[in-house]
Amino acid sequence: MSGSTLFSIGEALIDMIPSKVGCSFAEVPSFSPRTGGAPANVCAAFTRLGGKSTFLSQLGDDPFGHKIARELEACGIDLSHLAFTDKANTALAFVSLEEDGNRTFSFYRKPSADLLYAPEQIDPAWFREAFALHFCSVSLVDSPMRHAHLAAITAAREAGSIVSFDPNLRFPLWPDRAMLREAVLQFMLLANILKISDEELEFLTGTADIEAALPQLFVGDVQLVLYTCG
């Protein structure tokens, strides 16, 4: 591991934030567009802490895609490997907020530009600069982007980089929960660091007993589990 840059691969999208809390999508008066996507957010947070980050993804060659790129660049994120396409639009996620802070998502992403990001667009030489590669499960649906993840993870591991995985489960994006669980368990084997919530832990292991569930996550190359409650 010779690099000093955090690489992150996956989705960047527009979160449509409701103007009113505690009502259904149909009752929300209006929505405001905000740049989001967990892999992009990780880059932004790391850069704000003084680190260097590079984001690997693809956006639509549309107003929302260019808005995202401008805002990520303003955060100091390296976008030299970010692609644009006119084959699909930038993903949108409409958000409904409940009074207790819980969120419901409705995604417009069938497919979106990020899902068309192909393994051929990944250059293994990039990862000489990476000390770590981070990814989530939102882009692991059956698509070119899933295979791009495998290419990036393989290159990062061969370069000696740390691989970090946050499942960040979004059930509405998958045909069924069994397919999501299978994908997460497959990619979990390739990670060194796993970040997981209490809800995700129960979904993946089948038990809410923390002492029984957490040891089940130390599979493959997993060496560190970050467990969050709530």
Segments from the language model and where they lie:
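Glycine-centered short loops/turns at secondary-structure junctions
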Residues: 50, 76, 158-160, 221
